[in-house]
Regions:
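Membrane-proximal periplasmic segments of bacterial cell-envelope enzymes
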Residues: 1-314, 350-359, 710, 714
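Short alpha-helix boundary/capping segments
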Residues: 87, 91, 325, 583, ...
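Beta-lactam-recognizing serine transpeptidase/beta-lactamase-like catalytic domain environment
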Residues: 72-73, 78, 299-316, 325, ...
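Amphipathic, well-packed alpha-helical segments that form the structural scaffold of globular domains
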Residues: 286, 290-293, 301-304, 334-342, ...
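Solvent-exposed, polar/charged alpha-helical surfaces in well-ordered, non-transmembrane soluble domains
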Residues: 93-101, 209, 213, 238-242, ...
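Structural motif corresponding to the C-terminal cap of alpha-helices
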Residues: 336-348, 426, 599
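Intrinsically disordered, low-complexity repeat and linker tracts
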Residues: 681-740
Length: 740
């Protein structure tokens, strides 16, 4: 290559290098522009995603007894859940059909609260709401409102609206009903991209496996692990524990009288398909039991692809609620109550009306703790959902919480309250007497009677309580007036709420404000009749206040709130004094003397010879029903505390159609035996007493045999069976004619 050619090649090389440098400079400038100037914009385009947040439900806290034994707990279950975000453009109705067929094949049900039947042969539908069910009728009315229909709409009208709204006309009638029900449920649960739909709950592991096997053809259908409420001791305290359930439309959306709508539960962080406490302690302690839900975040990019799933907030389980009740003792009292009612029916109530129901409440005298609250009949918490119709149709009302909400005339159990009022106000003292000849003649034309069992002549307050002398309390009650003795009864715990954490009836004390008031009501109310009605838990609270010489504590079921992970005490219920009657002189001691002598008047009963002193007062109030003209059925009532001189427990008992209060004497002894067995460690898990000797075992066989006869102020034959006592014949309606 000559010199000229070499120069030409060099020039060309320089041009190429220059061109390459220019290109590199241009690319560099473009890169700078992309990265530095518009970098954020391009990054956003490249990472254009949307986060969807879903609630991870926290496990509900346990409810345990005083020893820490679980009564209510949460167990792991599995729900079939539809996630709309993951379903894409799938044929929803076709997918629902497939899920239904899989569930049916495994014997499962799905969420469907549409109160409409499958079509009959003529293609017509009917409502399945029970006529007598308030719950069903409310749900039916809400369904029509939700669908924009008038209340007179028929089942066919409802189905026509569903078929139109959800485009179901192409499906067979049976599938129209099935799919319509599911779509309606989706509407209730507000199914959306951010709110999953729970299609089936608590499915079996076999169903879980089946759904997973078909997962490729069921996009968006998930098996979600969930926490389900279970009652390990399902017959212990069911009325007080209450229930959990889904949030109703009425609780979710609240409209006030001014038409303003609020969503109070949503504001507290609930979702519409959450489970919530709806009654009893489950409701009262909802904030403690609920826990804190977690959050799962699903991230989807602009192409609809899920790029990330993360548990961004870990759920925290609810706190543990510890009761004041030992489940062993509760079972023992349940058993004793049932056996006492059975004994009354076998031995006494041979007539048409049987003793079929009752309640017994036991309190710790020292702080107002509830040790047992028994109802008979009762129900099984774990069977409530499946046997609700049977329970609600049962005429003996097993779902009714008699212990806290049953209102009963107290009868002569009210007399100690009148005695306290008379002594403390100075109307009488321990030496004051009233002459009893069996008839009270103060009122012209009205002469209420006394049985005079075991007494007559001049009667003092101790003797009047012992023998339940009506004439004594007629006279004292008239002189005091109901205004005065009601004020004392109220402070003792009658006719007002006891303070328990769950719903209870208030009751009523006969008052001059009553529409039927007349002066003679003051003497009837003084023996616990008239318009006075109280609850069994009020009777127990009243007995505890008498035992405490006038100091009334707030009655309560909850001992403490515990950390569910560590068991550490977060808060503890402290004894709370609600009222005090100072009690001048020996007021409460005189009442105690009278009450501790009552057991000796109940012959042929275990209570008459029990080795530990019991202070008690029976009551035999008349019911409004009669078994013959002028002859009323009777309830059996009892208040008691023991040991009489150093009280530990107080008892309130009611047995409907029980005949006479004395018939509950054996029940008091059975409760006492169970209590002392619990104290010395011989009470078994099922409520039976172990082999170790108890106080009752030291009595003779005759003393522990079921009572066969009643003397004193009760007769051996029940008036309900057709035999009439002279005093019963002459006692006007509304009086506690035969009582001890």
């Amino acid at each position: 290559m000559n010199q000229e050619e070499r120069k030409t090649a060099i020039r060309r090389m320089r041009v190429l290098v220059a061109a390459a440098c220019i290109l590199m400079l241009l690319y560099g400038l473009r890169l700078i522009f992309l990265q530095l100037v518009n970098g954020d914009d391009f990054k956003s385009q490249a990472t254009n995603t949307t986060d969807y947040k879903f609630t991870v439900t926290a496990a509900r806290g346990d409810i345990v007894d005083s020893r820490g034994e679980r009564i209510a707990t949460s167990v792991t279950g599995y729900n079939v859940v539809l996630n709309k975000l993951l379903m894409g453009d799938e044929d929803l109705d076709g997918m629902l059909q497939k899920i239904v067929e899989l569930l049916r094949a495994n014997g499962e049900s799905w969420n469907d609260t549409l109160l409409i039947s499958q079509p009959d042969a003529a293609g017509n539908y009917t409502f399945t709401a029970e006529e007598g069910s308030t719950r069903d009728q409310k749900a039916l009315a809400a369904m029509k409102d939700n669908l924009g229909l008038q209340q007179y709409a028929t089942a066919n009208d409802v189905m026509e609206k569903l078929v139109e709204d959800y485009d179901l006309a192409s499906f067979p009638l049976s599938w129209q009903r099935t799919l319509g029900g599911i779509h309606y449920e989706m509407q209730l649960q507000a199914f959306s991209n951010v709110n999953n739909f729970i299609m089936a709950e608590n499915v079996s592991e076999a169903t879980v496996a089946t759904i997973k096997e078909h997962s490729l053809s069921l996009p968006g259908v998930e098996i979600v692990e969930t926490s389900t409420r279970s009652y390990e001791q399902s017959t212990v305290l069911p009325h007080v524990l209450g229930r959990v359930g889904k949030i109703t439309a009425e609780k979710w959306k609240v409209t006030d009288e001014n038409g303003q709508t609020t969503y109070p539960l949503r504001e507290k962080g609930y979702n519409m398909n959450d489970i919530i406490g709806i009654s009893g302690l489950e409701s009262a302690y909802e904030d403690e039991l609920r826990g804190k839900d977690g959050v799962e975040t699903i991230t989807r990019n602009s192409d609809g692809v899920i790029v990330d799933t993360a548990l961004t907030t870990v759920p925290e389980p609810g706190h543990t609620v510890q009761l004041t009740i030992d489940s062993r003792f509760q079972k023992a009292v349940d058993k004793a109550l049932a056996e006492n009612i059975d004994m009354i029916n076998r031995v006494y109530n041979t007539g048409s009306m049987k003793a079929a129901a009752g309640a017994a409440v036991v309190l710790d005298v020292k702080d107002g703790s509830v040790l047992a609250a028994s109802n008979y009949p009762s129900f099984d918490q774990n069977l409530y959902a499946t046997q609700y119709s049977e329970y609600s149709a049962d005429e003996s009302l097993p779902l009714f919480n008699r212990a806290l909400q049953g209102l009963y005339t107290p009868g002569s159990t009210f007399k100690p309250a009148v005695a306290v009022a008379a002594l403390d106000s100075g109307l009488i003292n321990q030496y004051s007497t009233v002459f009893c000849n069996g008839v009270y003649t103060f009122y012209k034309g009205y002469s209420p009677r006394c049985t005079r069992h075991g007494h007559s002549g001049n009667i003092d307050v101790v003797t009047a309580i012992k023998w339940s002398c009506n004439v004594f309390f007629y006279d004292v009650g008239r002189r005091l007036t109901s205004d005065v003795y009601d004020a004392y009864a109220y402070k003792l715990g009658l006719g007002q709420r006891t303070g328990v954490e769950v719903s209870e009836a208030v009751g009523h004390l006969t008052s001059k404000n009553d529409s039927n008031y007349m002066e003679s009501l003051d003497v009837q109310a003084a023996i616990g009749q008239g318009n006075t009605v109280v609850t069994p838990i009020q009777l127990a609270t009243y007995a505890a206040t008498l035992a405490n010489n006038g100091t009334r504590y707030r009655t309560h079921f909850v001992k403490a709130i515990l950390d569910s992970n560590t068991g550490e005490v977060i808060s503890e219920t402290q004894p709370e004094v609600m009222d005090i009657i100072e009690g001048t002189g020996n007021t409460f001691e005189l009442v105690r003397q009278g009450m501790r002598q009552v057991p000796s008047t109940i012959t042929n009963s275990k209570i008459s010879s029990y080795p530990i002193a019991i202070a008690c007062k029976t009551g035999t109030p008349q019911r409004s029903e009669t078994y013959a003209p002028g002859k009323h059925y009777l309830n059996a009532m009892m208040v008691a505390y023991l040991p009489a001189d150093d009280p530990q427990i107080a008892i309130g008992i009611t047995i409907e159609y029980g005949g006479y209060g004395a018939r509950t004497g054996d029940l008091v002894v059975d409760i006492a035996n169970a209590y002392f067995a619990m104290q010395d460690g011989t009470l078994n898990e099922d409520g039976t007493i172990g082999k170790q000797e108890t106080a009752a075992d030291s009595t003779s066989a005759d003393q522990t045999a079921p009572a066969q006869t009643e003397t004193g102020t009760d007769t051996a034959t029940d008036p309900a069976a057709g035999t009439t006592d002279a005093a019963q014949e002459t006692a006007p309606a509304g009086q506690d004619a035969l009582d001890n």
